[in-house]
Amino acid sequence: GKTSLLRLLCGENIPHTGTVACGSRLQISHVQQDPSGLRGDLSAYAAQHGLDESLFKAILRKLDFARVQFEKDMADFSAGQKKKVLLARSLCEPSHLLVWDEPLNYVDVLSRIQLEELLLEFQPTIVFVEHDRVFCDRVATKAVTL
C-alpha cells in the first residue's frame, strides 16, 4: 500500500482507482526500498545521472563513505553502501520533490544520524515512508500515518 502510493506519486502506471494529478513540470527524485543492481564506479554513476560529481562524493563522505570506496565497483558494495549511493544521488539531483521509500533500510545507526543531519541542512521537500519514529519526529514537519 505505502510503496504503491509512492510509486503513483512518481507517475508509475500501476493499477489503481481514483485520480493522481501532478504538475507536468514537477521533477521528482525517487529512492526505492531495494538498493540492489548498482554496478560500475561512482564517477561513471554520477556522469550517467548528470550529477555534480564533487557534490555527490561530498555527500557520500558525510554519510561515512571511505574515499577508497570511490574507486570500487558498486557491485561489491554492501546493501547499506548502495542505499547511501541512492540517497546521495537523490540529494544531488535537480528536483522539486524527493520521494523515498524506507530510506533507513540497510543503513547503520551512525549513517542514520548523518542522514538526519543532511536532511536538516538541505531541508528538501520530501515524502517518505519510514518506520523509525525517532527519525520521523526529527526530520518531518508533517506526518501522515497509514
Question: Which residues does each predicted region cover?
Answer:
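ABC ATP-binding cassette signature C-motif
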Residues: 1-146
